[in-house]
Amino acid sequence: MSIKLKTVILECGDIPQLVSFYTSLLHWPVVYEIETFVGIHSNEDEMGIAFQYDENYVPPTWPAKLGQQQMMAHLDFAVEDKSALKEAVENATILGAKIADEQYGGEEWITMLDPAGHPFCFVVWNH
């Protein structure tokens, strides 16, 4: 038996906002869409991200603070080198992401927040 991760689902209060952000950032097409759930997948169809509507969505606090909404997961996106890292951060910022105030990864790992407040990272990943 073979099991592989296919899709990560992000809760949100504004699906179109996140679909626009991630399809523009990753150039992945929408592959499934209903009113309360939209999925996008890599062009190789290896991995996907889906956005599920939650009318009570509260953005996570990052880094975590006692008594605040906790992050349940975050996404790491690999880039080839520091130049690609800089370009990815600039592009994500133009698309509506924010660089997180707290950074722990040095020059090769940048934490950002998408337009709905989900943390994600760009990482110079050589393996």
What is each of the regions a protein language model found here?
Residues 100-104:
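Short loop/turn motifs at secondary-structure junctions and domain boundaries
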Residues 34-37, 105-108:
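Short acidic/glycine-enriched loop/turn segments that link adjacent beta-strands
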Residues 1-6, 10-32, 42-98, 113-127:
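Glyoxalase I/VOC metalloenzyme domain signal
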